[in-house]
Amino acid sequence: MKITDWPASERPREKLLARGPEALSDAELLAILLRTGMAGKTVLDVARQLLLEAGSLGRLLSRPVTELVSSPGLGPAKACELAVVAELARRLLAEKLPVADALTSPQAVHDYLRLAYGMRVQEVVLLLCLDARNRLLAVEEVAHGTLTESRVYPREVVKAALRQHAVAVILAHNHPSGDSGPSLADRELTEALGRALALVDVRLLDHLVISRQGCTSFAECGWLPA
């Protein structure tokens, strides 16, 4: 049965118009974007299959366009549309960061980092550079790693902080495994970076560990070096 043969109340687009986008499932929202299905499958079937294979909506939208193109039910046009949606969402959250105080609005920082980096398959280490009023100056990627780890040199972190004239910084990195719990190496790295930054009078305000499951704050857990 085609979606056009369904009762109007069950069709994704009509349901959205009647009840708003929040009433739709991930698959229904995705189906509206995709518009058409494929031989033997409705567009909703295709959307559900894409979500099932990816594991989640976040993982699906984090895939590169070259990978999306090869997914059943997608082609260059639809893959590009999905990539555009993901990028617009990232930019929307990024817009909030320059006007947000990193200390009084931590959720804006967490949301942006989780969307932009939580689904990455490689580890990335970031430095959020702040001024004397804790306003964001810049976000620098200071290290990239393999599927499981990255190598961070304190001198590179210090150079990035000084380059941005930062008074304080927030360190962040993702865990591709999906577990946002910090490792022993993360704890040791935080100690070393805290000491190195203190030598140039830059304060380490937090270290955030990001994953698709959540975000762990060293500051909230009391793990920052004294």
Swiss-Prot record:
PROSITE patterns: MPN (PS50249), UPF0758 (PS01302). Residues 102-224 form the MPN domain. The keyword GTP-binding does not apply. It holds the Pfam family UPF0758_N. One of its GO terms (biological process) is proteolysis. Coiled coil: none annotated. It comes from the Bacteria. PANTHER family: DNA REPAIR PROTEIN RADC, UPF0758 PROTEIN YEES-RELATED. This is UPF0758 protein LHK_01907. The lineage of its organism: Bacteria, Pseudomonadati, Pseudomonadota, Betaproteobacteria, Neisseriales.
